[in-house]
Amino acid sequence: MRSSPRVPSAALALCMVLLSFGSSALVEPKADVAAATLAWGQAIGGGDPEKVLPLYSDDAVLWGTLSPTVRSDRAAIRDYFVSAFKVLPGLKVTYGDQLIRVYGNAAVNTGYYTFSYVKDGETKNLPARYSFTYVKNGERWLIVDHHSSAMPSTHR
């Protein structure tokens, strides 16, 4: 009678560890993209264009919520945020649902967020939808394309 070969427990444990890395490797890029998006929101809340700009790649394109003009260079993107922070004082962003898809060194985060700001002493809200396209640069996910538009009103 033949007995089946025994797998040493250390080898089995090693296999389990390697398998767990494989599954977390699939989750980690999505978490990193979500963190990059959250960092953008925190930078927006700071009201300083110089904190927002480094989150965009050098060749980024921005279709901002407040402008009909596409911004396709760093100076134009900076000008957009200088203007936005003046028009919407105390600007903050709160995220709703997000759908993150990762394709190697590129990723897309699509969802909605609500901007809040203070006007005439009263807090106002501006719901909007967005798409961020990211490219991985070293260990950082940088925005290469950003589209944001006000949420359309519902028709009844």
Q: Where are the language model's segments positioned?
A:
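Bacterial N-terminal signal peptides that target proteins for export
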Residues: 1-12
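Short, low-complexity N-terminal intrinsically disordered segments enriched in polar/charged residues
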Residues: 15-58, 154-156
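A solvent-exposed, acidic/Ser-Thr-rich amphipathic alpha-helical stretch
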Residues: 30-36, 49-105, 124-125
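Hydrophobic/aromatic beta-strand elements that line small-molecule binding cavities or substrate pockets
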Residues: 81, 95-100, 113-115, 129-135
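A short, structured loop/turn motif at beta-sheet edges
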Residues: 100-107, 122, 134-140
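A short hydrophobic beta-strand element
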Residues: 105-115
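Short beta-strand edge/turn micro-motifs at domain boundaries
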Residues: 127-154
